[in-house]
Swiss-Prot record:
Subunit structure: Part of the 50S ribosomal subunit.
UniProt-recorded name of the protein: Large ribosomal subunit protein uL1
Entries under SUPFAM superfamilies matching the protein: Ribosomal protein L1 (SSF56808)
Organism: Cupriavidus taiwanensis (strain DSM 17343 / BCRC 17206 / CCUG 44338 / CIP 107171 / LMG 19424 / R1)
Keyword Ribonucleoprotein: yes
Family: Belongs to the universal ribosomal protein uL1 family.
UniProt keyword Repressor, yes or no: yes
Pfam family, one: Ribosomal_L1
Amino acid sequence: MAKVSKRVAANKAKIERTKFYPIDEALGLVKGCASAKFDESIDVAVQLGIDAKKSDQVVRGSVVLPAGTGKSVRVAVFAQGDKAEAAKAAGADIVGMEDLAEQVKAGNLNFDVVIASPDTMRIVGTLGQILGPRGLMPNPKVGTVTPDVAQAVKNAKAGQVQFRVDKAGIIHATIGRRSFEDAALKSNLAALLDALVKAKPATSKGVYLRKVAVSSTMGVGVRVDQATLAA
């Protein structure tokens, strides 16, 4: 373990906190600093040129990462009739109505994503205090309240990530795992940044994508030279 610690410490020492690195070098540094025995997530933080205190500048949405997230996702769906059958066929792990709501109320939250057909919101709406704080409440802005529950299930299973700007104007998201090839991580990052640009508020002025930094679950952040992202 001492050797690993020395290696990681040496890699961390290479990182200049104020320097902007080419994306390939940044990913190399991040992977080099990943010290955990598990396959750490590779995360990104994007500083946006918005005023997060203004309601018309809240950036929120979702995007399907082309290379996936490397994570197995369990999906629960509130639907009935044909939509319930379509959700099951698309790979949903749990499908129900009142019975699913009772499971949620009982604390059985064995899922990562909740999707709801619009006609079920009378039931789902009563679960806000349970699902909301956990980031599981379905919302049309991120595609989890939709008539096409089957497609929403497919998106979730394929590697869809949701994003929402925090109070500091920063978006945090996972773009893959340490085991991913750099090309996969770069394609996922490009897809995320493209989605953020499309979600840019009309009232946002000046530079929109101000800073981009990548890190591993247990590692330090490495700033990215955005000019190298299009390469």
